[in-house]
Amino acid sequence: MATNITWHPNLTYDERKALRKQDGCTIWLTGLSASGKSTIACALEQLLLQKNLSAYRLDGDNIRFGLNKDLGFSEKDRNENIRRISEVSKLFADSCAISITSFISPYRVDRDRARELHKEAGLKFIEIFVDVPLEVAEQRDPKGLYKKAREGVIKEFTGISAPYEAPKAPELHLRTDQKTVEECATIIYEYLISEKIIRKHL
């Protein structure tokens, strides 16, 4: 980090909270490709917006078109991908928005760092394991990525030729082969209410 820079203070979290009438947090959806992360994130964002709550979705694929377009899929690049997203999602949470991230984020240490980053800032971090058996994910395979990975066309593909480290103690564990997208979004919404991050909206 450069030594000739200065942190500039701005509005306090409490001032933003009073304006938005909600707490900020990061909802971190992690799981295999085709587990349903992005689909749940979209449904949750719509549900929150229907309740007049401020939310913003950060999607793994979309981010690689811009902020992280210089990164590949090596372990080092995956680490940097998640580090950047952790910082961005923290900024959204600090603005009292509900930041919804949907990234495979295969390494436990990266997710733990993201959690610690939020903890140091006094912000809530909600890790959600979007779980599905590998064989179900392969059957879904909407982008044909598992097929390409099995054929050796895609290298270092999570779940096939690269590891996925499942969360040990996530706030929520969703089995998407057993619950619908709408049920998963509702479970997360009700969790936010139970944790007093948001108030129940009729």
From Swiss-Prot:
One of its GO terms (cellular component) is cytoplasm. Keywords: Amino-acid biosynthesis, ATP-binding, Cysteine biosynthesis, Kinase, Methionine biosynthesis, Nucleotide-binding, Transferase. PANTHER family: BIFUNCTIONAL 3'-PHOSPHOADENOSINE 5'-PHOSPHOSULFATE SYNTHASE, PAPS SYNTHETASE, ISOFORM D. Catalyzes the synthesis of activated sulfate. InterPro entries: APS_kinase, P-loop_NTPase. This is Adenylyl-sulfate kinase. One of its GO terms (biological process) is sulfate assimilation, phosphoadenylyl sulfate reduction by phosphoadenylyl-sulfate reductase (thioredoxin). Its EC number is 2.7.1.25. GO terms for molecular function: adenylylsulfate kinase activity; ATP binding. Belongs to the APS kinase family. CDD domains: APSK. Transmembrane segments: none annotated. Present with 2170 molecules/cell in log phase SD medium. It catalyses: adenosine 5'-phosphosulfate + ATP = 3'-phosphoadenylyl sulfate + ADP + H(+). Signal peptide: none annotated. It holds the Pfam family APS_kinase.
